[in-house]
Amino acid sequence: MAKKAATKTPKYRDRSLPIPRRVADLLRRMTLEEKIGQLTQELAWKAFTNKNGRIEVSDDFRKILSGNGLGSLYGVLRADPWTGVTLDSGIGPREGAEAVNAIQRFAIENTRLGIPLIFNEECSHGHMAIGGTVFPVPICAASTWNPALVQKMTAAVAAETRAQGCTQTCSPVLDVVRDPRWGRTEETFGEDPYLVSRMGVAAVTGLQGKRLNSTGSIIATIKHFAAHGWPEGGHNAYPPHVGPRELRELCLAPFEACIKAGAQSVMSSYNELDGMPCSCHKGLLTGVLRDEWGFEGYVVSDMGSIKVIWQDHHAADDVAHAGARALDAGVDAEMSGGGYSQESIKLALQRGQITEELVDRAVRRILRLKFVLGLFEKPYCDVDRVEQV
């Protein structure tokens, strides 16, 4: 009787290989549709259902996944008036971990290559989920002038968040505030670029820990890049009026400090700088961030900020063109909006506005972090550990 041929383990599954080799092996196996899937970060507080304590993947998520996979999900456990999730309708920490595991398992088992998801959550001053510890808002934390305390606080936030299977946060906010009328001032570390830098580095260090594949570490996303905290009239997302020296010395200084400290994600902002929307500002996203500072992580857009390039800034012909401009500039993942949808990316490729190499570049950066996080080896969290944390 003939012996069944042994199935050879793909190189990207071999944890003994260097991460760049694993990324390269996985990337060459991917179809264009699977690559585009990795560029998307979908809103996901409706990705599961809770029927009398039974957690299941929702029909909405099944449709979104569509066989091509996704790069990441945003706000699976987010509970606040904006999502409509309340103490009555939401779920606690243990059930939250079960929900994240269920979604992750479905994504791995129902896609060809089984690429795990990154779960991105809001953690400005605690995991914005039911049962998360609530700490003082950043403006209050900065008032302590105690970076060591902020590092300890954010390490606790990271431990709670990772215990529920979530691996990234949309914080810290590094906007330097010079107009108290701006409605997001409490999210920041204040008006002084040196203090913002020191507190930002402390937060990044606390969130990311020594190794991103440890049980108490998550990716820190520094935001909003750039000059988002100085809007005209204090109106959110309005243009800032800053010159090149002010931009460098005041607005960019905290970002540079946090990149040097190892921050692995940057969020591009809604606003424009001197007429150029920040989410397609190649001089910032590639020239400064990568060429000058040596950033190796991935850039994610603020929610809908790529679509805003077209709709509000009128700097693109349509949403597909906006997506092409953002991808070329250096935005690797889109948080909602349609600029990086299957239809938009394919249309931009057809028009010659982007090349598949640009798609590969972004996917490569995202996959690298999934390997750094250890998600291919350990995609699920230990539900029993949640209550211990």
Predicted region positions:
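Glycoside hydrolase catalytic-domain context in secreted enzymes
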Residues: 1-389
